[in-house]
């Protein structure tokens, strides 16, 4: 379970960071 959660976080985090950096 944690492996899948970490994978999802790894995929979502860069998008969130780039979104915050744009604003």
Curated annotation (Swiss-Prot):
It comes from the Eukaryota. Disulfide bonds: none annotated. Expressed by the venom gland. Pfam families: Antimicrobial_4 (PF08024). InterPro entries: Antimicrobial_4. One of its GO terms (cellular component) is extracellular region. Membrane-perturbating peptide with multiple activities. It is insecticidal, since it induces contractile paralysis in insects (L.cuprina) during several hours, and death after 24 hours. It shows antibacterial activity with higher activity against Gram-positive than Gram-negative bacteria. It is also antiparasitic, since it potently inhibits the larval development of the major pathogenic nematode of ruminants (H.contortus, IC(50)=5.1 uM), but fails to reduce the motility of adult males of the other nematode B.malayi. This is M-poneritoxin-Nc1a. The lineage of its organism: Eukaryota, Metazoa, Ecdysozoa, Arthropoda, Hexapoda.
């Amino acid at each position: 379970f944690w492996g899948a959660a970490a994978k999802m976080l790894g995929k979502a985090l860069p998008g969130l960071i780039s979104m915050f950096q744009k604003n």
